[in-house]
Structures are given as structure tokens and as C-alpha cells.
Amino acid sequence: MKNLDKNIDGKSYANKLLKKIFPLSQEYFYKFNRKPSLAVILIGEDPASNVYVKNKIRTAEANNIKSIEIKLPTETLEEELLQKIVSLNEDVEIDGILVQLPLPNHISEQNVINTINPDKDVDGFHPVNFGKLYMGVPNFVPCTPLGCLYMLKNELKHLSGKNAVIVGRSNIVGKPMASLLLSSNCTVTLTHSKTKYLKEHCKKADILIAAVGCPEMIDDTYVNENAIVIDVGINRVADPLQNKKSMLVGDINYKKVYNIVKKITPVPGGVGPMTIACLMHNTIKAAYKNKKYNFIDILEDST
């Protein structure tokens, strides 16, 4: 049984954030006579993507956010998808647009992201939003790094001066996470597959964030006893205890690392719930911006 004293409970933090979001969505409804709205586009029948979309829609509906699910077949042409996005951009009743990734191989992910109106880009992947994040004037921040930062601020209270090491340099997690931590006055090391002496970098971390997509890659030889570990990885592997069944593991070897570090996010139940909660935050923010209404960001005060 997991000792909850060392676990960072992502579900609890997500619920804490959603409790702040729900009254904002109600206030929006009373002011503008409609719910904030989120359009979610799903292409194909990928089982994992279907689960993620269902979770997002369920959370939206539970928080008084209207969700519009648009399912398209795998063979949908890129031009057809781009035209659908353009129509959603022009629809004043749509506040946020999300295209579930990954996409079929014949569709350019970057072309799709570039087509979304930056003010409706609740995933925070558009180059305009990336640029604003790096300039220190963020518009929409990618949901997973935003959720990680929320948990870190609650766990540590003060991030200034902390050594933060990120394993993985993707546009979805690694790079925006580095920018957020730099803005919080951390000393940031962004590592990747070509980094030399990776263990030595990780061993020095006050904050270690794993987002490399390699099951249980980081073990007890990578960490120190004062580290706060955030495991972004979601990997499905064979369950050694149950024949023909699978299980979810992170990029951290939880069993080996748990007894050493100060705090750690489990998989599942760590980063995942916060990612969805931050998507709801971005959708509410987009809805208020759509109405040119002042939005006081509830994440500015994370405690």
C-alpha cells in the first residue's frame, strides 16, 4: 500500500482548482446567458485518445462548461480538418478549441496547431502563445506544465533559487516547463537524449521532472533525498502479475525512487488529473477573453 505522506495527490489538487473554476463558470453564465464552451476534435479511433477525450468532456460538463465533441474518421483530409478549425475560429459561441493529439500520419500536427486562433488555443501550443510564454507575458500555457507548476507551488511554497532538472525537451511539456520554472526564479537544466552525465544532473535536482516517454527509466540512482519528483510519463506496459493484462507506469521507477525522495507524483493519479483541471482553467480564461471581460487568473494565487 502506498504511503500517502510522500505522494503528491494530483486528484486532490485538481479538485481544489476545479472548486475555484465552477463558480467562475456560473458567474459567466449569469453575465452572458450562456455557458463557456469547449470544442474538442477527435480524429480516428485511437483507444487512448478516446479515453482522454471522454475524461475532458466529463470534467467540462461537471463544471458547467459546454463541450462540443467533433468526431472525424481517420481518413479525414488535412484540408477538411483545417476548414473545420477555421469555422470554429469564426464561431463566436466557441471559446476554446482542442484537437486531440496524436494525429494520423497524413495530417501535419504543426499545420493544425497553427490554424487554431491563438485566443481559442486552450492547449497553449500555438507559436504565438509559445512566444508569449517565453517573453514572460503568457496568454495560454500548455496544460500539463501549468498543472505541474500548480502542484510545485503548493508543495514548496517558494520556488526561487531551487535547482530544477527536466528530462525531456518536447514542446508539450519540457520546453514550456523550463520557461515556467525560469519565470519562478529556478535554476533550470533542460536535459534530453543527447545529454551527457544525465544521472549527475538529476542527482543535483531539488525539483526533478520526468517527461521523456521511457517506462521507468529513472531509478534510485538518479535522485537525492530532498528531491520533489514530478512524473509526467504515461506508459502502458505488461503487468507482470497478471498474464495478458497491462498497467500504467511513469518515466520514474516508482518503487525504487519512492523510499528515497521527499515527495513524488504517482502514476496514475498524479499529473493527469491536474492536466484536465488546467484545461478547464484555460477554457474559462478563453471565455472571459472572448467577451473582453477582465479575468483575474486564479492560478496566480496557487495556495
Name these PLM-found stretches.
Residues 1-33:
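Positively charged, low-complexity intrinsically disordered leader regions
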Residues 35-45:
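Short beta-strand segments enriched in small/hydrophobic residues
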Residues 43-57, 139-228, 232, 245-255:
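Glycine-rich phosphate/diphosphate-binding loop of Rossmann-like nucleotide-binding domains
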Residues 98-159:
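Anion-binding alpha/beta catalytic cores of soluble intermediary-metabolism enzymes, centered on
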